[in-house]
């Protein structure tokens, strides 16, 4: 099974969207493998977004991520990276489809509620960064009702 890193950003936490977001991933049939509420340190945020460090919006993004707690999660399931991105919606909420998290809950690109890994490689990197202690080893009893053999 594939894994992805999902982070509910400070605006999503402050607006009380944690349960709604978790529910959407659970209803799709994905399994929560790790979760923590974190106040992110500046140096850690800079490491997480290191690939964007040359962009003009980098400092604003870092300031935003450290402005309040985030919920860091790992989800597991078939094609969870690609499907997770579809559940999340386009980076710019104004072009996100209704029914996606950003399409339903966000307006500004700088307050777009959620982050999701964009590839298996970035998922592996982000999971290792955010969860060096490892993930929960379990499988839902619903597994055979969601996935074929």
Curated annotation (Swiss-Prot):
Binding-site list for ATP: 9, 57, 85, 91, 102, 112
Catalysed reactions, semicolon-separated: a 2'-deoxyribonucleoside 5'-diphosphate + ATP = a 2'-deoxyribonucleoside 5'-triphosphate + ADP; a ribonucleoside 5'-diphosphate + ATP = a ribonucleoside 5'-triphosphate + ADP
GO molecular function (one): metal ion binding
Keywords: ATP-binding, Kinase, Magnesium, Metal-binding, Nucleotide metabolism, Nucleotide-binding, Phosphoprotein, Transferase
Keyword Phosphoprotein: yes
The record's account of how the chain is modified after translation: Autophosphorylated.
GO biological process, one term: GTP biosynthetic process
InterPro entries referenced in this protein's UniProt entry, alphabetically: NDK-like_dom (IPR034907), NDK-like_dom_sf (IPR036850), Nucleoside_diP_kinase (IPR001564), Nucleoside_diP_kinase_AS (IPR023005)
Enzyme Commission number(s) of this protein: 2.7.4.6
Group of enzyme by EC: transferase
Cofactor dependency: Mg(2+)
Active site: 115
Transport found in the keyword field: no
Similarity comment: Belongs to the NDK family.
Its biological purpose: Major role in the synthesis of nucleoside triphosphates other than ATP. The ATP gamma phosphate is transferred to the NDP beta phosphate via a ping-pong mechanism, using a phosphorylated active-site intermediate. Also exhibits a kinase-like activity towards histone H1.
Matching PANTHER family: NUCLEOSIDE DIPHOSPHATE KINASE (PTHR11349)
Name of the featured protein: Nucleoside diphosphate kinase 1
Species name: Saccharum officinarum (Sugarcane)
Gene that encodes it: NDPK1
């Amino acid at each position: 099974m594939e894994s992805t890193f999902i982070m509910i950003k400070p605006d999503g936490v402050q607006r009380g969207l944690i349960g709604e977001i978790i529910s959407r991933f659970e209803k799709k049939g994905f399994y929560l493998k790790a979760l923590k509420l974190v106040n992110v340190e500046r140096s850690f945020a800079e490491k997480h977004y290191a690939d964007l460090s040359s962009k003009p919006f980098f400092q604003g993004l870092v300031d935003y991520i450290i402005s309040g707690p985030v919920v860091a999660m790992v989800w597991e399931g078939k094609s969870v990276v690609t499907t997770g991105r579809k559940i999340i919606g386009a980076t710019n909420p104004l072009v996100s489809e209704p029914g996606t998290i950003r399409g339903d809950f966000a307006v500004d690109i700088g307050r777009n509620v959620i982050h999701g890994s964009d590839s298996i490689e970035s998922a592996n990197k982000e999971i290792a960064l955010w969860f060096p202690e490892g993930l929960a080893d379990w499988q839902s009893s619903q597994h055979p009702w969601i996935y074929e053999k």
